[in-house]
Amino acid sequence: MLDRLNFIENKYEELSIKISDPTVMQDQKEWQKLCKEHSDMETIVTTYKEYKEVLQSIEDNKEMLKEDIEQELRDMVQEDIKELEQRVQELEQELKMLLVPKDPNDEKNVFIEIRAGAGGDEAALFAANLFRMYTRYAERHNWKTEAVSVNETDIGGFKEIVFMVRGKGAYSRLKYESGVHRVQRVPDTESSGRIHTSTATVAVLPEVEDVDVEINQNDLRVDVYRASGHGGQCVNTTDSAVRITHLPSGLVVTCQDEKSQLKNKEKAMKVLKSRLYDMLESERSASIAEDRKSQVGTGDRSERIRTYNYPQGRVTDHRIGLTLYKLESFLDGDIEEMIDGLITVEQSERMKDIS
């Protein structure tokens, strides 16, 4: 750990000189990039400097104890050493946390895709419950939500819904929601009172910039058609809905939420870029995830991550074994405690890797 900290400190000093160089400032794009890199290192370097200063103070005090000093002063020095040693432990933990690699996507906006799984109409209603849960959670953070694509059922459920969440740090907290969500409850249509199990799949994708993923326009097929509502009835007299197919990967994205064909195409392209980026990232990180079987999981769409049990009023996250008996408020967006638990477990796993 110390070797890495020394490397970061040296790099920070080099960058301090570079960003003060007038010739480097002439290239604004490069200068801003270096300034960001410098700023990202500042906290860890400041903490490391304090860590070294505290260690030095301990050594200085120990040297003082070797001298012939009065008992009262000796007691004070020994008390100082105790406090400083406690501070060293605190700083070591802080440094370990700061050394945990940050996900470069953490500050980005996200696309959330919810699809009804096994369970027919009941699964579609559960998908609608999850959509409401995430929009309510977004409201608690003052994040904005915006529908991209909606396939609604006649009874108010969703076969599929894709929506965007805009806000600082949205991906850092919502990324843990990818996977299969399972619900156990008695459907309104069930006369015998038998509990049914249904599922919905959630995919959370970071919004990507053009520089993150390149798409060859020749690899795309764009189809336009008239937007439809419940039961397929036409709700628009123009071909405003857009379907984009990425031929090499077979990915298909549709968007009909906007009245303008151009806006629907822009939204669909954003979703397509995020899906392609997610596909590439999943392939890249597959070997890492295999080497270190994380409790929090890999974000695999097929991984059953959580159960919502209505009769018992509980929600259980199977990745960390956490059960909360507050299902009603949880589905109203009160999911912070669960997400904090997932973050804590992931951070502790990463800290083990550093140690």
Swiss-Prot record:
Cytoplasm recorded as keyword: yes
Localization per record: Cytoplasm
Gene3D superfamilies: 3.30.160.20, 3.30.70.1660, 6.10.140.1950
GO cellular component, one term: cytoplasm
Modified residues (N5-methylglutamine): 233
GO molecular function, one term: translation release factor activity, codon specific
PTM text: Methylated by PrmC. Methylation increases the termination efficiency of RF1.
UniProt keyword terms in alphabetical order: Cytoplasm, Methylation, Protein biosynthesis
Main subcellular location: cytoplasm
Pfam families, A to Z: PCRF, RF-1
InterPro entries the record matches: PCRF, Pep_chain_release_fac_I, Pep_chain_release_fac_I_sf, Prokaryotic/Mito_RF, RF-1
SUPFAM superfamilies in the record: Release factor (SSF75620)
Domain of life: Bacteria
PANTHER family, sorted: LD18447P (PTHR43804:SF7)
Function: Peptide chain release factor 1 directs the termination of translation in response to the peptide chain termination codons UAG and UAA.
Family the entry assigns: Belongs to the prokaryotic/mitochondrial release factor family.
UniProt name for this protein: Peptide chain release factor 1
Organism: Clostridium tetani (strain Massachusetts / E88)
